């Protein structure tokens, strides 16, 4: 059983945020029955409006949990999950467009996919793609989704240095003032995204 409590004004990006950003107090309790054991309590996460923040730590310290709580506070937002979540039988293009802004047409989405995944057949089923290609399709989907924040949970897993750096460059080019929240165990990922605001768990 999990109980979540949040307080504050939420982690908003451009819309509805104070000029210096916003914060949320996050709490998480776990257990089989009440009283539940606190796993996270009184943590205030502040991300500047349009800013870039990294949550860093080893596997199992709660980075994904923290990002999931933050995602609930900053909706609407887009997210790249640690475990790739795509529709296997749908095409790369259909997956990229699944929550895209209505102003995004298929040709624009296809161009982004080809930029992130050089040589990809955008009409190929996701099941036919490699793990690294799937990861980049998910990054494309997140960038095409509307919202005030982009949340990335270990987004470069399985990518080599060149692919990571190329993806990071595209992410930075397309943020368009949105808040960026990254979780990673590798400081190189934060540097690739020009993040200097780092929280260590």
Regions found by a protein language model. Give the residues of each.
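Conserved ABC ATPase "signature" region
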Residues: 9, 106-121
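The feature captures the beta-strand-to-loop junction immediately N-terminal to the Walker
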Residues: 56-58
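Q-loop/switch helix immediately C-terminal to the Walker
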Residues: 83, 89-102
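Walker B catalytic motif
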Residues: 125, 154-155
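Conserved ABC ATPase signature
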Residues: 125-129, 133
């Amino acid at each position: 059983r999990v109980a979540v409590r949040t307080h504050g004004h939420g982690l908003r990006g451009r819309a509805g945020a104070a000029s210096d950003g916003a914060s949320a107090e996050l709490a998480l309790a776990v257990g089989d029955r009440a009283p539940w054991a606190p796993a996270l309590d009184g943590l205030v996460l502040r991300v500047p409006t349009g800013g870039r923040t990294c949550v860093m730590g080893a596997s199992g310290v709660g980075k994904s949990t923290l990002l999931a709580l933050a995602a609930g506070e900053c909706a609407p937002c887009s997210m790249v999950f640690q475990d790739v979540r795509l529709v296997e039988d749908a095409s790369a293009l259909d997956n990229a467009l699944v929550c895209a802004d209505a102003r995004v047409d298929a040709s624009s989405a296809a161009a982004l996919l080809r930029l992130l995944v050089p040589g990809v057949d955008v009409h190929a089923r996701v099941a036919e793609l490699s793990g690294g290609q799937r990861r980049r399709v998910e990054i494309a989907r997140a960038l095409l989704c509307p919202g005030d924040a982009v949340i990335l949970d270990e987004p470069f897993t399985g990518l080599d240095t060149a692919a990571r750096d190329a993806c990071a460059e595209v992410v930075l080019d397309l943020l368009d003032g949105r808040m960026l929240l990254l979780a990673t165990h590798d400081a190189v990922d934060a540097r690739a995204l020009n993040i200097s605001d780092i929280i260590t768990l």
